[in-house]
Amino acid sequence: MLRAAGNLSKSMMKSQRRFLNLQEFQSKEILEKHGCSVQNFVVASNRKEAEEKWMSFGDHEYVVKAQILAGGRGKGKFINGTKGIGGVFITKEKDAALEAIDEMIGKRLVTKQTTSEGVRVDKVMIAEGVDIKRETYLAVLMDRESNGPVVVASPDGGMDIEAVAEKTPERIFKTPIDIQMGMTEGQSLKIAKDLQFEGKLIGVAAQEIKRLYDLFIAVDATQVEINPLVETADGRVFCVDAKMNFDDSAAYRQKEIFAYETFEEHDPREVDAHQFNLNYIGMDGNIACLVNGAGLAMATMDLIKLHGGEPANFLDVGGAVTEDAVFNAVRIITSDPRVKCVLINIFGGIVNCATIANGVVSAVNKIGLNVPMVVRLEGTNVDAAKQIMKKSGLKILTANNLDEAAAKAVSSLPK
C-alpha cells in the first residue's frame, strides 16, 4: 500500500486504466478551492510574469519549484544548467529567485523519475516561504486490502515515505475509513495525535485532515498526498507540497479537474499507446518489452537487468487485449530507435495466446522487424499460438520460461 502512496500511476485490474496526474500548482489550486490551508503561491512562465504576480508576497522566503509531473525535483539536475541548482530553489533574496526562474524555464530537468533526456520546464511555481517548525506526512488513498479509503500518516514528513516504512515502520499509522460513513471526528483527532500535534493544534490539524478527506471523496481522487503537512512556528497547519491522482472513470463528472489534463510532458509513444488501452512507460534501455500484467512486466524488467540488459519500456497489454492492440503495441515499442531486441512475455489466463501470436505476426509482416524477437508464451491456447508463429516463417527466438527468455534477449544484443 505504501508503494501505492508513492506512485499510484501504476495500474489496473480488469481493464487498462490510466490515472490523471496533476502538477503541484494545480493540486494546490484544488486544495485552496476546497478550503484547505496552503501558503501564498503564483505560477509563471517567465521572469517578468513572476515579478508582476508576487507583488503581494511579504519579504519572506521564496520557494521556486519547477512544474513537471515527475518527482524528485529537489535532487534533480538541469541539462546544460549553469547555476548548479535543482528543480527546487529556496532563497530569501528576490534577485536570486528571479535568477533561478531564468535557470529553470525552457531547460530540461532530469530526476530519478524521468529518463536521461529529462522533461522540459515551461512553468515554475513561486510560493511564499513559511516558518516550518515540524514536518509530517499525510496521504488519503484507495486501498484494495481495505476495499476503500485509507489514511496513511507519519510524524516523519518531508522525506520519502518508503524510506520511513523500511527504517521505522512503527512511525507509520494507517486508518481505514468507511466510505459510507465518512471520516468521524474521533478518527480525525486520532490521526492528528498520530502526527504528534499537541494542545490546540490537535483540533486545528484534525479539521485540516477532515477537509483533505472530504476533498478526496468530492473530486473522485485515487490519491491525495501531502508531504509535508507542516506545523509552523506561529501555530498554523499548512499543506506545503501536494500530489493528487484521479481515476479516469470519474472524468464524466469531474470535468473541471480533467480540463487540467495535458499531454505536453508525455512521451508521444505513451500518448499513442493510451489510444489502444495500452499502459506504456518509456525507459532508457534497448530491450523492448511486451507483457500482460503489471507484476509480470516488472518481473520481466528485473530479469533483463539481472542478465545485464536494460529494458527500453514498460508495456502491459492488459487482460482484454485484441489483435489490433497487439499490432499497435509492437508498432509502438519498435518505433523507439534505441531498441535492439524485442522480448514478448505472455502468461495467458484471461489473455488468449493465439490473439497475441496473430497480432505479433501481423505487425511484423506489415511493419517489418530488423531486430531479434524473443517470445515466451504460456497458458490459454499456447499450442495454437506456437503453430501460428511457426507457420509465419518469421525468425523468432522462442523460450520455455521467463529466465531463458531474458537471457536470450540480452545475448541477442549486438556486441
Curated annotation (Swiss-Prot):
Keyword Magnesium: yes
UniProt GO molecular function: ATP binding; GTP binding; magnesium ion binding; succinate-CoA ligase (GDP-forming) activity
Catalysed transformations (reactions): GTP + succinate + CoA = succinyl-CoA + GDP + phosphate
List of residues binding Mg(2+): 227, 241
Ranges of residues in domain ATP-grasp: 28-258
Residue stretch of the organelle transit peptide: 1-19
EC number: 6.2.1.4
Source taxon at top rank: Eukaryota
Cofactor(s) of this protein: Mg(2+)
Classification via SUPFAM superfamilies: Glutathione synthetase ATP-binding domain-like (SSF56059), Succinyl-CoA synthetase domains (SSF52210)
Pfam families for the chain: ATP-grasp_2 (PF08442), Ligase_CoA (PF00549)
Subcellular compartments: Mitochondrion
Pathway: Carbohydrate metabolism; tricarboxylic acid cycle; succinate from succinyl-CoA (ligase route): step 1/1
Swiss-Prot/TrEMBL GO biological process terms: succinyl-CoA metabolic process; tricarboxylic acid cycle
GO cellular component: mitochondrion; succinate-CoA ligase complex
Co-factor binding details: Binds 1 Mg(2+) ion per subunit.
PROSITE patterns xref list: SUCCINYL_COA_LIG_3
Enzyme class of the recorded protein, top EC level: ligase
InterPro entries: ATP-grasp_succ-CoA_synth-type (IPR013650), ATP_grasp_subdomain_1 (IPR013815), Succ-CoA_synthase_bsu_CS (IPR017866), SUCC_ACL_C (IPR005811), Succ_CoA_betaG_euk (IPR034722), Succ_CoA_ligase-like_bsu (IPR005809), Succinyl-CoA_synth-like (IPR016102)
Chain positions recorded as substrate binding sites: 292, 349-351
Keywords recorded for this protein, A-Z: GTP-binding, Ligase, Magnesium, Metal-binding, Mitochondrion, Nucleotide-binding, Transit peptide, Tricarboxylic acid cycle
Site description Important for substrate specificity, residues in chain: 61, 131
Its biological purpose: GTP-specific succinyl-CoA synthetase functions in the citric acid cycle (TCA), coupling the hydrolysis of succinyl-CoA to the synthesis of GTP and thus represents the only step of substrate-level phosphorylation in the TCA. The beta subunit provides nucleotide specificity of the enzyme and binds the substrate succinate, while the binding sites for coenzyme A and phosphate are found in the alpha subunit.
Family stated for the protein in its record: Belongs to the succinate/malate CoA ligase beta subunit family. GTP-specific subunit beta subfamily.
Official protein name in the record: Succinate--CoA ligase [GDP-forming] subunit beta, mitochondrial
